[in-house]
């Protein structure tokens, strides 16, 4: 790669070459023009790890804690470190552009991708995202803020029209993008799938050009989400530089024709190409060649950072009677469906094949010096557990054979064209390629041998994007080839899991075969769903057991144990791109199991893993409760570090946890109805709503305890004299003394809130405007400074003037942290002023 003379290159490009540059060539690469030294660039998903170019059978990667977990750290320095490692992982994968971070707002607990965004609050989300991007781009890799904007649900995400006031748009949904860009000018922005007030974002000139480019002065590259381009002329004229993925649907000959008919002028195409070439120059110093090989890093120092991030994200929700930390020397009983499952990431774009994972059971076992016992408690899988890791090939290897054909099984003498050895029996084939496969229609036989450890009836399940028949010893057990039903897996492309059963004997070996046909063989109606490649498969199995039997056994064991930890929650099956959750509840049986174990042993510790809030009807019984999110590679070790006190928890909730789904402000207005969703809560998202209507959530935004105690004192403000205009921001510096009044070293997160004066406009009771994290030894006191700009601390969006309004009056400043102590002071705004810009 070489630095390009952008203007000279534009002059030398033909119209056909310009048009080609404005769209990808495949799922992960941009177009090249070799004669002018313009190479193809590689892009890769990056919500919580850099997957590389393959969903299917790809090169493993580091998996970071999910964004809500990172949001819970409230730690800008940590986010900077995470961003740097993300950049280094990207370079190892030969990737120039990371498709992240996600900074949408969780207006509902049910959003399928809620775990991908940092927080329900734009200030927390935007500041963390800015530092994350700064660390990432320091490596030379380009960051992509997404999804711009209001991509806050999965239901009908390609078509839904988000009806939202401009005030809510500015104060809630655009704010994290605005604040992130003040900290780090990211190289890229990705548009959202949805419409806003009638127009798809990827062709919305007001959003892309008027606000992003002109008002904010940003000059990077705007790309579509994958298959999120819906027009030729409208999108190119609105400012969409790059259509992804390729091959193009809307550019190519269609764009050339639009230019020839003056639907789009060539100088507009030049503007799009200019941004693409500027991106080439941004990433050129990396020296990553076209189609670079992908490799793994997995360095010890990276593992240490991942473990620290996992531990620092764990929120101590309750710790009555100082149940925690646990005693290492005592025996411990570990209960629950998440104990031996590594719930390390959510589903969809965030999913990847991690270098390794650590389950909570493994994490606890590694640190306990006493006996560690286990009880299942309940099964909480949405679909049957993967069978692949329990199979063996005919030559004794773990896993199964994956044999590919162009013809169906009914064709005699068909030719084998590819054979792979796999362990995971879940595969999304959107990037599988073979030179002998010319279309998306092909067939796969997956064959392995299963030897059960116990007698019983075994349930088998098959989920496909395509068709599938599962045989056990040549007997058809599951037929998922006819009368298929739409499911939620694999971005919403897959069928419902179809099941069948067979009685098996312990120690006897059975041949298991899945006959799979790719997506074109399916009869599902896929309208409104993003179609990703040739299809996918998933097959699982489990011995049929009684949940009541499991719960009773767990409760009985708990009644006799001195230390008990329950691990429950969700997994990537329940929280995933392509599907919103139907409710906030834990999987069936989980609440009953937790409640009965707590009845049997009131000192049992409950650990919940989920990316977004869940209901906790047993919370009043629990003395000790942790929220542990999806913690990445090191999730099990991170949780164990907090349980045993190696790490003193400091995390605070980045989301409000309502008592029940009906309490959340978007309850009446979530999901698409007749193609639209009304953002009826307006600016009252999350804590803004609960505080305005005086409705207590189960656990509020910003809540989190510690193994030590803190006090705050000596709050003071230093303000900047007012000027006629507010464009320079007029910084306000809050200084507060923080003391560790306990006996354990720990970190405190100081939160600065501003409450507006009474005006003629309805405003939230208070809003977060700044925060800082400080580490203190026992008895140590430090002064903490938080600087906020007056214009950001005081302003609301005036729809009549189409400007931010900083109104005259007295503004109260509140400083909070761990515990109930609130420090207060105030400052004056002497004159109402209006402003625009970043």
From Swiss-Prot:
UniProt keyword list: Carbohydrate metabolism, Cellulose degradation, Glycoprotein, Glycosidase, Hydrolase, Polysaccharide degradation, Secreted
Positions annotated as active site in the UniProt record: 225
Domain of life: Eukaryota
Family assignment from sequence similarity: Belongs to the glycosyl hydrolase 3 family.
Domain PA14: 395-555
Function: Beta-glucosidases are one of a number of cellulolytic enzymes involved in the degradation of cellulosic biomass. Catalyzes the last step releasing glucose from the inhibitory cellobiose.
EC code(s) of this entry: 3.2.1.21
Entry-listed glycosylation sites: 197, 493
UniProt record, GO biological process: cellulose catabolic process
Signal peptide: none
Catalysed reactions, as listed in the record: Hydrolysis of terminal, non-reducing beta-D-glucosyl residues with release of beta-D-glucose
Gene Ontology MF terms: beta-glucosidase activity
Descriptive protein name: Probable beta-glucosidase I
EC top class named in words: hydrolase
GO cellular component terms given for this protein: extracellular region
Pathway(s) it belongs to: Glycan metabolism; cellulose degradation
Localization, UniProt: Secreted
Protein's organism: Neosartorya fischeri (strain ATCC 1020 / DSM 3700 / CBS 544.65 / FGSC A1164 / JCM 1740 / NRRL 181 / WB 181) (Aspergillus fischerianus)
